Amino acid sequence: MGLKINRPRRGSMGVYPRKRAADIVPRVRTWPEVNLGKPTLLGFAAYKAGMLHAVVVDDRPTSPLYGKEVVKAVTVLDAPPLYVAAVRLYTLDPTNGYKVAVGEAWVSEPPADLRRVLTLPEKFDTEKQLKALEEYRDVAVDVRVLVATQPRLSGIGKKTPEVLEIPVGGVPSIDERINFAISLLGKTVSPKDVFTPGQLVDVIAVTKGKGYQGVVKRFGVTILPRWHKHRKGHRRTGTIGPQAPALMFTQPRPGQMGFHQRTEYNKRILKIGDNGAEITPKSGFPHYGVIKGPYILLQGSVPGARKRLVVLRYPVRPPKKAPPAAEPQVVWVSSQSI
């Protein structure tokens, strides 16, 4: 028997095509069904400010360090309140089973900054639109709100808001969801209204862009020895595939790297604060600025560059052994940004 040669393929076909994301604002395709006993939004949006390290009391009962202080790397998200601009109802299309929007109601006078991104009339007849929504209350299967970020309240220094759609969940009753969504119309929602410290969330963002890269950096291809038999190149693959078929998608090839939408599951919220001065370094976060209002401390890293919009979502696949639901005890947060 000859020597068995086995090597895992380079890269993953699960993330093809490796091209730039269509929009820097993440598009969430899946939302979980949660039962909290009260209606709530299933997600929130915040801006990535930077990373710090914090001293936290380990609250995992099975950990050898249970009850002791440990150092954790944390990501700081600038989370100004979201403005609820509209309510939208969905029903099922009888021909294909897809969800289709059947009506929406906008706040009578949208914020001026919202006109930077959307073409809106001077005023909406909110009462008329709400009456029209009542006709679809019996056939509605999903309730969502259109929210706008408020970057003027962040440390970015931009004015144009991002607009995204967030479902209402927490209870199985559609009537309760509709009433809750209508009650939010024209109001703001803070991170404390959606999440609690200690819970797990999914993080969705567009990663840092790296531009056009070769196979070594893009796929981790082995660099060939620099001798005469490899005179045609060293930072390249030995072959790009057979003559037929002419194109092999499984073969590592150079191309776009980064600026892809990615989802990371089950990040734990360590703290939700109201005063960003508590955790902002003396000189501000590098390449970001000063956090003026609410913030979120997440354990671990988050995809994307500073100033990038990050969408937080209730977890779609929470672990069987979830960490304690109680609020973690954060002893100290560094004032030195990573």
From Swiss-Prot:
Residues 228-255 are annotated as: Disordered. GO terms for biological process: translation. PROSITE patterns: RIBOSOMAL_L3. Residues 228-237 have a biased composition (Basic residues). GO terms for cellular component: cytosolic large ribosomal subunit. Keywords: Ribonucleoprotein, Ribosomal protein, RNA-binding, rRNA-binding. InterPro entries: L3_arc_euk (IPR045077), Ribosomal_L3_dom_3_arc_sf (IPR044892), Ribosomal_uL3 (IPR000597), Ribosomal_uL3_arc (IPR019928), Ribosomal_uL3_CS (IPR019926), Transl_B-barrel_sf (IPR009000). It holds the Pfam family Ribosomal_L3. One of its GO terms (molecular function) is structural constituent of ribosome. Belongs to the universal ribosomal protein uL3 family. Part of the 50S ribosomal subunit. Forms a cluster with proteins L14 and L24e. One of the primary rRNA binding proteins, it binds directly near the 3'-end of the 23S rRNA, where it nucleates assembly of the 50S subunit. This is Large ribosomal subunit protein uL3. It comes from Pyrobaculum calidifontis (strain DSM 21063 / JCM 11548 / VA1).
